[in-house]
C-alpha cells in the first residue's frame, strides 16, 4: 500500500533547490565580514581547506542519507536505528526555531522594498523636528539610515524588558512573508521545484548587475584593494580557522534536515556525489562573488564618507577663519591646517576638538555584519548612488529571493517528516499541514515585531541553532559510520548509484569531520562559559548609538530552553525507545 | 559704529557662492551688497510699523573674502538699531526670496542665529508603501486561493474516477454544479476531456 513518493521533475530542480537553500543571506552579509575581520584575501585559505575537508563530505553524507532512506529527517534516522530518531526530531525542532525568526528578515526586506519606491528614499533624510528649523535629535546623533532602521522599522525599545506592543507595520510585512512562503510550499515539490528556479537564479542576476555598477563606482578600487590585500599573519590566528569552519558549516545548512528532505525526493540512482560537490562549490563561489560586490560598494561608501569628512573640515576651517570660499581643497588641506595652527594658535586650539580626523583606512576598517550590514550600511551606500530607487529595489529584491529560497529549505525540513508520518498525512491534506505550520510560525513570529522584538531576534539568531546543530551533525556522522556501519552504507551507495565511494570520503566521514566538529563544539562551549554573563546590544535613543547590556534572568532562561529543547531530543528519544523496548520484552517474556 | 561684529541686533551672514555655483560664481562687490541691502529692506518693510525702512537703513560691515559680513537695520533716525527679533522674523519670512535673488540655498546663504525653516517632506495621505503592499498582498492571496481550489477540484475528480463507469462521473459533475450553484457543465466536461490523459499519471505520482 506504499504510495509513490513525489519526485523532482528533473535533477536540475534538485540542484537548484539545494543551491537556493544553501546560498542564503549568510553568503551576502556574513562572509564579507569574516573576510574583513580575518585578513582579507588570506581568509580564503582556511575557508577553502575547510570547504574540502568539512563542507563537502558532510554535505555528501546528508544528501546520501536522504537519497538512500527516501524519508524526511525523522524517518531517515529512525530507519538507521530507532535509538536515533531523536536526531531527526532535534533537526525538526531547530528548523522550527529557525524558520520562526528567519522569516522576520524577509518581512524587513519587504518593508524596505516597499519603501524603495519613494523619492527621496525615506532613509536618506532625517525627519524634521517640531518647529521645522532642524532635524530630529535622535536622527542627527545617529544617521538617517540608522534612524530608519531602529526607529521607523523596529521602533526599538531601550531594553529587552520593555516589550512594547506588536507593531502593525512589521506585523503586516511578516504576514505577507509567510503568505509568500506558503504559496511556494503549498504543493510540495511540485510547486517548490518551480519556485527554486527563480529564487536560485535571480540573486545571481542582481549580483552581476551590482558587480558592474559596483566596479564603476567612484572609490570601488579602494574597497577591493582592502579586501584582496592578504594579511598573512591571520593564518596563524586559530579564530580565523574556527570561523572558516563555522561559516562553511552553517552556510551549507547542515543538520537542519532540509538537505535530507530535498534528497529524499531524488531518484535513488541519482549521482549525489556530483551534486554535493557542485552545490558546495557554487555556495562558496557565491560567497566570494558576493564579497567582491560588497567590497566594491564598501569602497564607494568609505570614499564617499571620507570625502564628505574632508569637506566638513574644510567648511569648518573656512567659516572659522573666514577663508575665501573654495580656497581649501583636499590637496592643500593639511598645509593650510599647519599654517593656521601656527598663525592663529589660540583660535586654532579652541576649535581643534571639532576637527574630525578623516581617514579612509578607518572608514574601511569598520566591519559590520548581519542585519546591520544589509539594512544600515548598504542603505547608506545606496542612498548616495544615482537612481538610488532602482538600486534599492534590486538589492532588497535580491535579499528577498535569498531569504525565501532558504525558507523553502527550512520549511521542507519541517514538512517532509510531517507528511511522511502516516498518522498526520492520513487525516490532513498536504495543503492543510503546510498551512498550519506557516500559521503557527507566523503567530509566534509576531513576538519579533514587538518593540523589543529585535532583541529576541538576536537571542534566536545567536543561540537557537549554533550548538544544537554541531551536536546533531556530530551524532549524524557517528550514526552513519559506527551505528549503521560505514561498510554497509558504502555498499548501499554503490548499489544505489553504481559507483564505489572513494577512500577520501570515508576518511573524512569516519575521522576528520567528527573531530573537527568536536573541536568546534568544545571551542564554542568554552567560549560561552568563559564570557560569563551573556550580554546584548541595546539601542540608546538619547545617545543615538548601541550600548551593551546584561541579559535579564528570564532571557537567560529562554536561551537555556532554546538550546535544551533541541539537544535534549536526542537522549530523550533514545531513552524513550529503550524503555519502550524493555516494556515490550517484559510483555513478551511471560508469553514465551 | 552701530554695525560691528557681535554688536547688539547685528547678524552675521555667510555666503558660499563658489560652492553653490562653481564656475558660474559671481564676484561679491558693492553692487551685490546693494542688492543684499535691498532684499533686507524689502523684508523689513513687510513687518508691521516698519514700512518706512529704506535701503540706506541697512548697514554692512566687516566684509571678508570668505564672503561673510555683519549687518544691522537701523530705524529712520539712524540712531539705534531695530530689535533682533523683528529682523529675524522678517528674514525668516522671506528667506526663500532672498535665496533666489542670489541663486543660493539655505546651506550656501547662511544667516547665523537665524535658523531657516526647512521644507517639510512630502506627506501623501496614504503612504506609498501601503499601496504596494496591498497590491502584492492581493496577488498572493488570489494565487493561494487558486492553487488550493484547483487542488481540491483535482482531488475530487481523482476520487471519483476509479469508482467505475460514466454514471459515477456524471454524478460527480452534478454534485459540483450544485455546490457551486452555477451550471457549469460544459466547462467541467471540457476540463474532464483535457485532463483525462494526465489523471492516471498524476495518480501514480502524487500522494494523498
UniProtKB/Swiss-Prot annotation, chain A:
Membrane association type: Multi-pass membrane protein
Keywords: Amino-acid transport, Cell membrane, Glycoprotein, Membrane, Symport, Transmembrane, Transmembrane helix, Transport
Name of the protein this chain belongs to: Sodium- and chloride-dependent transporter XTRP3
Name of the encoding gene: SLC6A20
UniProt record, GO biological process: amino acid import across plasma membrane; amino acid transport; amino-acid betaine transport; glycine import across plasma membrane; glycine transport; L-isoleucine import across plasma membrane; L-proline import across plasma membrane; proline import across plasma membrane
Gene source species: Homo sapiens (Human)
Family matches, as NCBIfam families: Na_transp (NF037979)
Residues bearing glycans: 131, 357
Cytoplasmic-side positions: 1-5, 64-79, 187-194, 263-276, 411-431, 487-504, 576-592
Function noted in UniProt: Mediates the Na(+)- and Cl(-)-dependent uptake of imino acids such as L-proline, N-methyl-L-proline and pipecolate as well as N-methylated amino acids. Also transports glycine, regulates proline and glycine homeostasis in the brain playing a role in the modulation of NMDAR currents.
